[in-house]
Regions:
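Short internal beta-strands
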Residues: 66, 77-84, 110-116
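Short, glycine-rich nucleotide/cofactor-binding loops
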Residues: 47-62, 86-91
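Bacterial N-terminal signal peptides
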Residues: 8-20
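A short aromatic-anchored loop/beta-hairpin motif
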Residues: 102, 111, 127-142, 149
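Signal peptide processing junction and immediate N-terminal pro/mature segment
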Residues: 21-34
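A glycine-rich helix N-cap at a beta->alpha junction
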Residues: 95-123
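Positively charged n-region of N-terminal signal peptides that target proteins for export
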Residues: 1-6
């Protein structure tokens, strides 16, 4: 179902560009990319909560699984949350930053807890890396209550 919606949205975009060039109206009534993403069942959405300051765990499990889960389509939507000591580790480690860039390019949503990032002096660097740094208590609670799957490392 989500593949059909994605193809419909992509097809509509191409058709819309062609029609715009000819002066006709684009597809109406099809869901936007945001609407299609929001229509996913919670069971198809994964939240990876990374809190550990252990580099080996990050490189050899957390980042590897999150990236492959998105690329291989094991989960339709992956949100990666950086919270606690992981914020400090990421802000100081170029190799982990490169891996995070791959995750961003794959379409993984990147978020971080601002309170923890500020404590470690990492908020600025995380923002530079494309991470949405914000209060995470309410968003994480909402993810859990809506039934998303949560993995914690």
């Amino acid at each position: 179902m989500t593949r059909i919606v994605k193809l419909s949205v992509i097809g509509c975009l191409f058709l819309g560009l062609a029609l715009a060039a000819s002066g006709s109206a684009p597809c109406e009534g099809l869901p936007s990319a945001t609407e299609a993403q929001d229509s996913l069942a919670p069971a198809d959405r994964l939240v990876v909560l990374w809190t550990s300051g252990d580099r080996d765990v990050a490189m050899n499990m957390v980042f590897m699984y999150a990236l492959n889960a998105k690329r291989a389509g094991w989960w339709a939507d992956v949100t990666f949350i950086i919270w606690g000591p992981s914020a400090k580790l990421l802000s100081e480690d170029a190799e982990l930053q490169a891996e995070l860039g791959k995750m961003k390019a794959a379409g993984i949503v990147l978020e971080a807890c601002i309170a923890c990032a500020d404590r470690y002096g990492a908020s600025g660097k995380l923002r530079e890396l494309g991470v949405d740094v914000k209060g995470m208590g309410k968003p994480l609670t909402a993810y859990i209550k809506e039934g998303r799957r949560v993995l914690t490392f």
